[in-house]
Each structure stands twice: as C-alpha cells, then as structure tokens.
Amino acid sequence: MKFVDEANIRVEAGDGGSGCVSFRREKYVPDGGPDGGDGGDGGSVYLQANENLNTLIDYRFTRFHMAERGTNGRGRDCTGHGGSDLVLQVPVGTRAIDQETEESLGDLTVNGQKLLVAKGGFHGLGNTRFKSSTNRAPRQKTLGTPGEVRSIKLELLLLADVGLLGMPNAGKSTFIRSVSRATPKVADYPFTTLVPNLGVVNPRPGQSFVIADIPGLIEGAAEGAGLGIRFLKHLERCRMLLHIIDIEPIDGVDPVYSARAIVGELEKYSPKLAAKPRWLVFNKTDLLLDEEIQAKIDRIVKELDWQGDVYTMSAYNRTGTEELSIKMLDYIRSLPAIVEEITADADVEFKWDNYHSAEDENANENYDDDFDEDFDDDDYDVEVIYQR
C-alpha cells in the first residue's frame, strides 16, 4: 500500500434542529397551551486513532466529510432526534492542524484516542420554553445554530525511539535491514529510500525499540533540494537521533562538509529537533584499513568539534551493529518515561453558548400580546370525561 503521510480534508458538523411552534389542541381542550418541542443537536466530527491503519491514503480520495443534522422539534413536546456523530479513523501518530488559523488541534498518539475537530450545532428551542405568567401562548421559537466547518490538514508522524539521519547513500537503509526485519530497498544510487521505514530492533529477549529510517538529506533541503525536509517531521517524536556518516564516500565529498550540511538543515527545520540527543556513527569501515579508520575519525571529530558519542560499524558486514543496538537500548531505557501531559480544558466560549439565553430574554421582554385571553393554566391537568 502506498505510504501517504499528509492529507487535506474538510469537515462539517451537523446543524442543530430548529424548535417548533405548536399548541395543544384536543377535543374539549380548546386552549391547551404551547407544546412545541426542541430540535435535536447536530452531530459532531471526531478523529480516532486506529492502530490497524498506517497511512492517510483514504483521505486523499475522500476529502469532504459531513456529520448528520439534528431534526426539527414537533408538537406534543416531541424533541427532535440528535444527529449522529461522524468518527474518522486515522493512524496512531496523526496530528490535526486547522488550515485557516494554522492552529494545532491535537495529536493522536494512543490507540482509541478521540479528538473533537468540529462541534455540532446546538438545538433550537420550541415555544414551550417561552411560556411564562405573562406570555401564556408564546409564538416564539429559536433556530438551531450551524455546526462548525473546518479545513484540516492531517499529518502522520511516525512513532519511533531512534531516528536515522544522513546523506543519501550513507547506509541508513542497510543499517535498519541489518538490525531488524525491515526490508527497505537498498541500491547503489542516491535517494533509493523515498518514504520512511520503521523497524523493530530486539537486542535482548523481551526488550526492543523502534527505529525510523527517512530519505536522505542534502544541502539546500530546506529550500526544496532533493526530497526536501518534509520527512524530518517523522523524527520529532524520536527520543534520540543516529547521525550516520559515510567514512569513505564514493563521490569524494569530505564527510565533515556532509555532516555540517545535515546539522544545518536540521537547525533550519526545527531548533528543538536539532537539540535532541545525537550520536555520530561512522559507517562503511570495511572499506578502509584499521589504522586509516581511527586517523580519519579523529580528523573528522576534531574539525566538527564534536563532544558527544562516536561509534563505528559496517552495516553491510554487520560489524559493530549488534553492540551499537545494545548501547542504544540501554540509553533509551535510562531515559525517563514519557508522560502524556493532560492540560485543563480551556474556557472557550462558543458562538452558541449564550445564544438561547439571550433569545429567551429578548422574547420575554418584547413579547407580542397575541395570545389567548381565556387561557387557563389548569388545562394542563384537565380531566376529559367522554359521555354519550
């Protein structure tokens, strides 16, 4: 199945049903009073995380989604039926962004988690609601409020513990194949990897972590060179980064220059992402003699002024990959557990929150005197006796 990590959709919540103006009319009860029911609430639109999905491809072809409208109220105090909510299934790790305000509506990081993206309209009030001692036969009602309409951008961010960084042909896909059962395409030309890949690494029985491989970066990616930086978003949730450097590039480019270019593109995209823990890993050591390897590493580390962790491996021969996997596992397990921050709901005033109270006050202040003069409140409990 094609991997799609972005989609634009339009969601429309259902409108609220309108209230009803009706009066009780039965045999022997000519002035029964108001009995118009309220309308039903409009259906809302939700996003729900589903662990069985791994792509947003369905939303590339179906872009418009609408919840059900609430039905209108009826006589005899019949309330309208509320509209059914619309629940859209998305992969775990999906982020919803309002395209008009560029506001992040929320992230779905747990299976089954739901996110409200468009609230349904509130129901209208029937004329029974406006009954009072001075307005005993009201002919007022309110309309249901319209449901929210939003244009939303869906972004799928992969959930992984370790993210791989590096130039094209640095050996990232070969590394993920050597330490996991993932099978990304490997070839001797740049940009073999066109979409992100995930692999589960099991260095010890019962202990594992997830590693993410993204397409390679080149200088100028922030301006759109190569495949651009659109795939860097998949590293935002990684707990550490593995910067893989080709120690003996076939094109003769200095590894120092390549490493600085990667860091520069990372900082342009997100300083927060650039500040994540990062290890340097020199790959393709099988192409050099042992004495050449250390000399070259010392020179690169010195020119980069690197103070962090440094490792060597040959992903093709699987030399050093197992030891590196164990060290990554130990480091990840030493990090504090991720705790989901639960923030208090913001006190947001929706446009319909005070709508009905205002309409009620306005109706009672400016009511029409057009009502039945002989109306009797006791008619609600009247006992009807049928005689021949």
Curated annotation (Swiss-Prot):
Q: State the HAMAP family in the record.
A: GTPase_Obg (MF_01454)
Q: What does this protein do?
A: An essential GTPase which binds GTP, GDP and possibly (p)ppGpp with moderate affinity, with high nucleotide exchange rates and a fairly low GTP hydrolysis rate. Plays a role in control of the cell cycle, stress response, ribosome biogenesis and in those bacteria that undergo differentiation, in morphogenesis control.
Listed cofactors: Mg(2+)
**What keywords is this UniProt entry annotated with?**
Cytoplasm, GTP-binding, Hydrolase, Magnesium, Metal-binding, Nucleotide-binding
**Location relative to the cell:** Cytoplasm
Q: How does it assemble?
A: Monomer.
| UniProt source species | Shewanella frigidimarina (strain NCIMB 400)
Q: Where is the Obg domain?
A: 1-159
GO terms of biological process kind: ribosome biogenesis
* Enzymatic class: hydrolase
Question: What is the official name of this protein in its record?
Answer: GTPase Obg
E.C. number(s) listed in UniProt = 3.6.5.-
Positions bound to GTP: 166-173, 191-195, 213-216, 283-286, 314-316
Instruction: Give the record's family classification.
Output: Belongs to the TRAFAC class OBG-HflX-like GTPase superfamily. OBG GTPase family.
Q: Name the Gene Ontology molecular function terms of this record.
A: GTP binding; GTPase activity; magnesium ion binding
Classify the main location: cytoplasm
What gene codes for this chain?
obg
